[in-house]
Amino acid sequence: MARIAGVDIPRDKRVVISLTYIYGIGKSTAKKILAEAGVSEDTRVRDLTEEELGRIREIVGRLKVEGDLRREVSLNIKRLIEIGCYRGIRHRRGLPVRGQNTKNNARTRKGPRRTVANKKK
């Protein structure tokens, strides 16, 4: 397995897919990286030369990925919570932040249902 940005990327997959195993790199970013490095998207990781791997590592090194990106995202969320804005309050309460409906759905954010007992008639 080749290591890029501290992540072991799978050898048997195409390079464009393998790069998406790195947090912060999706398909479009992976394609841009390979175009800049001059590597074909169809190449398998095991077929890359050390020179090509070095060029890819250098380009990925200039991007904000993995730990740095995770830290920035968590600091942004902490900042929103501290200033007490609407989005921060939604984060604090564990509710959807981007305006989604919460009457019926939003189970991913709210967690399992907490059933409320009915008053007997």
Swiss-Prot record:
Source organism, top-level taxon: Bacteria
GO cellular component: cytosol; small ribosomal subunit
Alphabetical list of InterPro entries matching this protein: Rbsml_uS13_C, Ribosomal_uS13, Ribosomal_uS13-like_H2TH, Ribosomal_uS13_bac-type, Ribosomal_uS13_CS
Pfam families according to UniProt: Ribosomal_S13
Record-level Gene Ontology MF annotations: rRNA binding; structural constituent of ribosome; tRNA binding
Biological process per Gene Ontology, one example term: translation
Alphabetized UniProt keyword annotations: Ribonucleoprotein, Ribosomal protein, RNA-binding, rRNA-binding, tRNA-binding
Stretches with biased composition (Basic residues): 106-121
Region span, Disordered: 94-121
Quaternary structure and interacting proteins, as annotated: Part of the 30S ribosomal subunit. Forms a loose heterodimer with protein S19. Forms two bridges to the 50S subunit in the 70S ribosome.
Family, per entry: Belongs to the universal ribosomal protein uS13 family.
Function: Located at the top of the head of the 30S subunit, it contacts several helices of the 16S rRNA. In the 70S ribosome it contacts the 23S rRNA (bridge B1a) and protein L5 of the 50S subunit (bridge B1b), connecting the 2 subunits; these bridges are implicated in subunit movement. Contacts the tRNAs in the A and P-sites.
Name listed for the protein in its UniProt record: Small ribosomal subunit protein uS13
